[in-house]
Amino acid sequence: MTGCGSCGKIIKNIEKKYYNQLKEKDIVLVGGAVNLDDEEEVKKIMEIRKNSKVLIAVGSCAVSGGFQRMLIGLENGFPQRFVRIGDVVKVDYAIIGCPPDEEEVERIVKAVIEKDKEIVDSYLILKPYEVIAGKPIIDAYMKVNDVLLTSNKELCLGCDDKPINDEFCTGCGTCVAKCPANALTIDEKPKVNISKCIKCGTCFFNCIRVKEALLP
């Protein structure tokens, strides 16, 4: 699919390591957003879905449309052209990040292979892409609290218009440095420009405090 290629490298490494298990269980990992203007790309993702029992969307482009929606096309972007995989086919599990941590992807893939319900349920897509407000992600500027991306509210990146918890935050600035959309600035504590936020989850998964509190 369409993306910067970083998630593709991670997927390639995981597929190489777990090739036999993935093939045996018909598990496929897909990264990148779907370009609706590319007929072959749309056919490809539909064929992938048809031939797999489990489809895991890897990275923010695959899960939410990613930076293409905002950044390709410079000032205007193309939010209606580049869509998440789940807008075209059913997605079973979603791993957010721009790109996600490779060790985290491997941990989840192993859990899916081994049917470790305790781990995989946190990344299970709600039937499919069920939303809190009763509407899907169509507009790239839709408020993030309209959408619940996963079944685990603690890992959900769409549950609050103010993703920075000032009491929890140490002000280290890691999230600001990592944000691919330049939606974060820092003045003692990070500030979020919601209009620029692409809901990629990079800030969340790079936060040292979050990793300490939520991720094993």
Swiss-Prot record:
[4Fe-4S] cluster 1 binds at residues 169, 172, 175, 207. Gene3D superfamilies: 3.30.70.20, NADH:ubiquinone oxidoreductase-like, 20kDa subunit. This is Uncharacterized protein MJ0726. It comes from the Archaea. One of its GO terms (molecular function) is oxidoreductase activity. The keyword Membrane does not apply. Transmembrane segments: none annotated. PROSITE patterns: 4FE4S_FER_1, 4FE4S_FER_2. Belongs to the FrhG family. Pfam families: Fer4 (PF00037), Oxidored_q6 (PF01058). InterPro entries: 4Fe4S_Fe-S-bd, 4Fe4S_Fe_S_CS, Hydrogenase_assoc-protein, NADH_UbQ_OxRdtase-like_20kDa, NiFe_Hase_small_N_sf. The lineage of its organism: Archaea, Methanobacteriati, Methanobacteriota, Methanomada group, Methanococci. Keywords: 4Fe-4S, Electron transport, Iron, Iron-sulfur, Metal-binding, Oxidoreductase, Repeat, Transport. The keyword Nucleus does not apply. Residues 160-189, 188-216 form the 4Fe-4S ferredoxin-type domain. [4Fe-4S] cluster 2 binds at residues 179, 197, 200, 203. It comes from Methanocaldococcus jannaschii (strain ATCC 43067 / DSM 2661 / JAL-1 / JCM 10045 / NBRC 100440) (Methanococcus jannaschii).
